[in-house]
Amino acid sequence: MPGIVLRSDDNFDASYRRFKKQTDRNLIVTEARARRFHETKTEKRKKFLIASRKKMLKRLYMMRRYESRL
């Protein structure tokens, strides 16, 4: 669990920023959002297929963009 030690010269904004960085690195917020609602296997499969399709289209776009420069 992330935690920060408050320094005497830190203000609230700096401390909050350090805490937020730690939680982002540990993926705590994203994991909590994922566990908030139960996902069925079908929903997981759909998300995976959408993500893979998106990756493929991105690669295709980058490849076409690269080829157009040649």
UniProtKB/Swiss-Prot annotation:
UniProt superkingdom: Bacteria
One GO term (biological process): translation
A molecular-function term among this protein's GO annotations: structural constituent of ribosome
Gene3D superfamilies xref list: Ribosomal protein S8
Signal peptide: none
Keyword Ribosomal protein assigned: yes
GO cellular component terms listed in the entry, alphabetical order: ribonucleoprotein complex; ribosome
Family: Belongs to the bacterial ribosomal protein bS21 family.
This protein's name: Small ribosomal subunit protein bS21
Protein species of origin: Sulfurimonas denitrificans (strain ATCC 33889 / DSM 1251)
Gene of this entry: rpsU
